[in-house]
């Protein structure tokens, strides 16, 4: 199974009250990224350590209980791709 982890432990996250958007600052590159709710929560799961896609999805299903489970699973898949593309997340070896 592939496990994903954040590329840096020095990422700085900021969630704005009352909104569905958050930002993350990457001090390595100086880049700031805008995150949707699922991407932010995915990162929060990974702050504690690498996880498989299934582990991330289970965590999201607990976090977003009112949402359609199939939609949440698709949103997690999309969030992982966005985070990988942005350089914030990658696969890690066991």
Per-region residue spans from a language model:
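Long, low-complexity, charged/polar intrinsically disordered regions in eukaryotic proteins
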Residues: 1-30
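Long, charge-rich, low-complexity alpha-helical segments
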Residues: 28-94
């Amino acid at each position: 199974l592939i496990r994903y982890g954040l590329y840096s432990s020095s990422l700085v996250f900021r969630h704005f009250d009352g909104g569905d958007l958050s930002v993350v600052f990457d001090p390595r590159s100086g880049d700031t990224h805008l995150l949707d709710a699922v991407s932010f929560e995915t990162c929060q799961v990974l702050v504690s350590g690498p996880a498989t896609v299934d582990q991330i999805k289970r965590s999201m299903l607990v976090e977003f209980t009112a949402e359609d489970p199939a939609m949440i699973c698709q949103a997690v898949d999309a969030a992982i791709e966005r985070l990988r593309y942005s350089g914030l997340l990658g696969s890690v070896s066991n």
